[in-house]
Amino acid sequence: MDNYEFSELLKTLKNKVGNIASIIKPENIQTRLKEIEELENSPSFWSDVKQAGIIGKEKTKITNLLKNYENAFNALNDANELFDLANSENDTETLEALFNDASKLEDTITSLEISMLLSGENDGKNAIVSIHPGAGGTESNDWASILYRMYLRFCEREGFKVETLDFQEGEEAGLKDVSFLVKGENAYGYLKAENGIHRLVRTSPFDSAGRRHTSFSSVMVSPELDDDIEIEIEEKDIRIDYYRASGAGGQHVNKTESAVRITHFPTGIVVQCQNDRSQHKNKATAFKMLKSRLYELELMKQQDSANTGEKSEIGWGHQIRSYVLFPYQQVKDNRSGEAFSQVDNILDGDIKKMIEGVLIALKAE
């Protein structure tokens, strides 16, 4: 990097921070924080625990947003001042240090962008994730299990907690279906970027001839709904099936029909839960999953999303990302246009940067 390149970078970052400031309006955030502080000092505030909790979450979110803005604003100002001073004194050592720290400065601005992008109504919620393999038998089932592991590792990296709601093992390898709840700050905000079809190209370990195979898996993500959000489900629109939960190798793990499957006829959505030994608890969780999916479906309709509705055919039509392991190694996201060569790292859960690139790209559209 040289003087000209760094100068252009500073201009770009200054424009970004300026645009973000015009959107989030830091002065309005400060005013709102003062209002919340006054509310908290009122004796009657804590009598409504539910409302206090809602306002508490709002306070945390906007405090973090303001903090990220101030960090970015101050870092950019400091870099500008130091750059001007170093140039006026022909201080090559300081200039070199600034050039070396350019990526850190960019990361600070990116953190602000992501903080702004994750300030939506549902972004802070927990996420319900379901993975379904496409046609292709064992190969597709294995691909679904690879994706499942990738998300588990991502959750570990981010400090998210995972609760498996339903898991159906594949006959030879992999899995037929999995649903899990991800708990943590902005879990849905991040994982909503994974909604869609994921394509794998590789030499199949299940093909004795060593041929190249293409597999697809569908990932569906919806926010875990708060109790105050009401989704009406009519009894005539659903069918509830009860069956015995199965474990590894298809063995039944208990003697009662504790597992629950709910089919929603108008949308074709099917959810199932076998996480608990209690049929009653599994039924309650399955209804929660269904409401979450219906809510997500409505959000997609409102946003006029290309991925509206159930993915009736898993294939090229709704593909969001390709993972190529052979004849070369690359992961490419169709929405951001970004390509990554560190395939092993990505499949080991290092997907945060890729997700952030998608969030920024979608916001720019």
Swiss-Prot record:
N5-methylglutamine sites (modified residues): Q251
Superkingdom, taxonomy of origin? Bacteria
**Mind telling me how this protein is modified after translation?**
Methylated by PrmC. Methylation increases the termination efficiency of RF2.
Keyword flag Protein biosynthesis? yes
Which SUPFAM superfamilies does UniProt cross-reference here? Release factor
Q: Where would you say this protein principally sits, based on its record?
A: cytoplasm
Disulfide-bonded cysteines: none
Q: Does the keyword Oxidoreductase apply?
A: no
Keywords (alphabetical) are:
Cytoplasm, Methylation, Protein biosynthesis
Q: Where in the cell is it found?
A: Cytoplasm
Q: Which GO molecular function annotations are given, in alphabetical order?
A: translation release factor activity, codon specific
Q: Which PROSITE patterns does the UniProt entry name for this protein?
A: RF_PROK_I
Q: Which family does it belong to?
A: Belongs to the prokaryotic/mitochondrial release factor family.
Looking up PANTHER family in the UniProt record yields: CLASS I PEPTIDE CHAIN RELEASE FACTOR, PEPTIDE CHAIN RELEASE FACTOR 2
| Role, per record | Peptide chain release factor 2 directs the termination of translation in response to the peptide chain termination codons UGA and UAA.
Instruction: Please report the name of this protein according to its UniProt entry.
Output: Peptide chain release factor 2
Source organism of this protein record: Campylobacter jejuni subsp. jejuni serotype O:23/36 (strain 81-176)
Gene of this entry: prfB
